[in-house]
A protein has these predicted regions:
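Extracytoplasmic small-molecule ligand-binding "clamshell" domains
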Residues: 1-64
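An extracytoplasmic/periplasmic, membrane-proximal ligand-sensing/linker region
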Residues: 1-20, 200, 207, 211-271
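Short loop->beta-strand "edge-of-pocket" segments that line small-molecule binding or catalytic clefts
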Residues: 2-14, 106-122, 163
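Extracytoplasmic/secreted envelope proteins and their assembly/folding machinery
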Residues: 22, 45, 60-63, 104, ...
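Short helices/loops that flank or line small-molecule/ion binding pockets
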Residues: 42-56, 69-70, 105, 150-170
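Acidic, polar ligand-binding/catalytic clefts
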Residues: 46-106, 127
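Pocket-lining segment of extracytoplasmic ligand-binding domains
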Residues: 99, 111-212
Length: 271
């Protein structure tokens, strides 16, 4: 039996979704878990690197960053299967529904909002794919900037701060702007998609591999059983995902490669 207080650290957008599993984990693992909110993904990575958190929920690119600074001390254990049965999601570029822009090419010389430099769908993946399609954001757009989050990116487009923004998108029934409309934050149909990336593997739940092996096994077993043992807690945790799929480092090798190429480009520009 483990008597320490263990920590699950999450990026801000994941915090409210997973908060309910704290008592469930306490009961199943016979130990105290506490859920904390990180200010951003970089804060979650740093907390895990420093040994202040045992578990985390990271974006794919943030996992790549964590792997770069922690090596094999961190590993993914699960990712969500969404309500359409998919184990991945997309980056999409949004514009106002009543704007004249119909495709990315129409946005040459306009402005683009990224969400966060450590975001997979909000920065790393769209930048890489746009360059591959001959539209380097640094020169294609008149101005780019960071909005701070996916929701703020949607608001920046609606408010006219940026002509377009890139955000996360799982499917028509589960995406950033659909959730905002359901909450009454924006009118339904206020934005539309003009570009969509290939499928990105869903964000991983990660664990520190320097934890006792018995605790790691119990954590994995507890998460694996959660969808059937406490369906409501799982729905709260996952935004109505269908289930969990086992995740491994190899699933994120393409994301790691994109991160390395993006980092190399930044080094070249600085030199």
């Amino acid at each position: 039996m483990f008597h320490h207080c263990h920590r699950i650290l999450l990026g801000e957008s994941a915090f409210l979704e997973i908060r309910r599993i704290q008592l469930d984990a306490d009961r199943e693992l016979r130990t105290n878990f506490r859920v904390f909110r990180g200010s951003d993904y970089a804060a979650v990575v740093e907390a895990m690197r420093a040994g202040h958190s045992e578990l985390g929920y990271l974006g794919p690119a943030s996992y790549g960053l964590a792997r770069r600074v922690m090596g094999e001390r961190i590993a993914p254990i699960f990712r969500y299967i969404d309500n359409e049965g998919l184990e991945g999601y997309h980056s999409v570029m949004l514009v106002k529904a009543d704007s004249p822009f119909q495709q990315v090419q129409d946005l040459r010389g306009k402005t683009l909002g990224f969400s966060d430099p450590n975001s997979t769908s909000g920065f790393q993946v769209p930048g890489w794919f746009l360059r591959r399609q001959g539209m380097d954001p640094a020169s294609f757009f008149a101005r780019t900037g960071f909005t701070g989050s996916h929701e703020q990116g949607v608001m920046a487009v609606i408010n006219g701060t940026f002509d377009a923004a890139v955000v996360a998108y799982s499917n028509e029934r589960r995406n950033t702007f659909q959730r905002m409309a359901e909450k009454g934050m924006i009118p339904s149909g206020a934005v539309r998609v003009v570009w969509k990336s290939p499928l990105i593997p869903n964000s991983p739940i990660v664990i520190r591999k320097d934890l006792p092996a018995a605790l790691q096994r119990e954590v994995v077993a507890a998460f694996a059983a959660l969808p059937e043992r406490d369906p409501q807690a799982f729905r709260d945790m996952s935004s109505d995902a269908r289930g969990l799929a086992v995740a491994k480092h190899e699933d994120y090798l393409d994301i790691v490669a994109i991160l390395e190429e993006n980092a190399a480009r930044r080094r070249e520009r600085r030199s």
